[in-house]
Amino acid sequence: MPLNKRFTLTQYLIQERRRFPDARGDFNALILDVALACKAIARAVAFGELGGMLGNHDADAGGSINVQGETQKKLDVISNQYFTRMNEWGGHLAGMASEEMDDAYQIPAEHPRGKYLLVFDPLDGSSNIDVNVSVGSIFSILRAPQEAVESGRDVVEADFFQPGAEQVAAGYALYGPTTMLVLSVGNGVAGFTLDPMLGEFMLTHDKLQVPENTQEFAINASNSRFWEPPVKRYVDECLAGKTGPRDKDFNMRWIASMVAEAHRILMRGGVFLYPRDSKDAAKPGRLRLLYEANPIGFIMEQAGGRASTGREPMLGVQPTSLHQRIGLIFGSKNEVERIERYHAEPARAEMHNPLFAERSLFRS
């Protein structure tokens, strides 16, 4: 009988593996290595300024910018190191890719190579770390091409260019009031809470499901002037509340930490929109496909929700570059499908704004 009638992460993985009698232990061991990295990051986040963890990475006092053009925080760099060091040695991986690394990460020659690829955002929402807002780690596991596994060659970027539907597993860790690991191995979604006394992730939320309907949405409204008409229409209808076409009131949220947004939606429903927009022509989408949109999309779909670009299912998108950006909408199924319908409808000659249909602050 598991301790306190709860399964540990290890016990859960063993139980899942029993569904596949011919499976080896490589996959479970890889998940546990990822979990170990998340435990180390949780500890670093918890110490904060006491451990000298806050602020920008100095890179010998010159600062550092990642491949995204973003200033790296100390914890970005430290978290990336935890992920690479704790996953490179086990013999489970053919290679890795990260938000914080320009190129694919090769497994050092002194370590054996395996049949999986690991892609990750080591610290999502790190811009919030200095103000003590919840942050997290996101990861995705793919199968390496068989030819690469058999030859033992170095991985190349194209090896990672697999649609989200090809993911073997995906998950995230949330570093908040408690540390949680949320995981899907393709058989639903489970949540594990870190027991700080035992140092073990314990199964606390089994078979998580996203409610189909919701009255909450999350979007950065400061970008409204750059939104496409279908997104404007959807948000306007939500804001119109009971007096508008939706005939019910909505609440708007925005944390600026996608892991925190995803976790709230997973627990109580909602819809998250970081849509394609015209703010920067070079970046029509903001979130990274391989290590942000795909793993979160996989979790949402496994929990009965939906993930989309607005125009097509997120998990069907064919990646074309390692750090490819994309618009992302996910959450309660009926709301995401509504937004997809709005994108599919012919463009309106004039957008109807239910908030200002009768009177507007901007009328002459």
Curated annotation (Swiss-Prot):
It is found in: Cytoplasm. Substrate binds at D124, G125, S126, S127, N220. Its EC number is 3.1.3.11. Mg(2+) 2 binds at D121, D124, E292. Pathway: Carbohydrate biosynthesis; gluconeogenesis. It comes from the Bacteria. It catalyses: beta-D-fructose 1,6-bisphosphate + H2O = beta-D-fructose 6-phosphate + phosphate. InterPro entries: FBPase_C_dom (IPR044015), FBPase_class-1 (IPR000146), FBPase_N (IPR033391), FBPtase (IPR028343), Fructose_bisphosphatase_AS (IPR020548). Homotetramer. Belongs to the FBPase class 1 family. This is Fructose-1,6-bisphosphatase class 1 2. It comes from Polaromonas naphthalenivorans (strain CJ2).
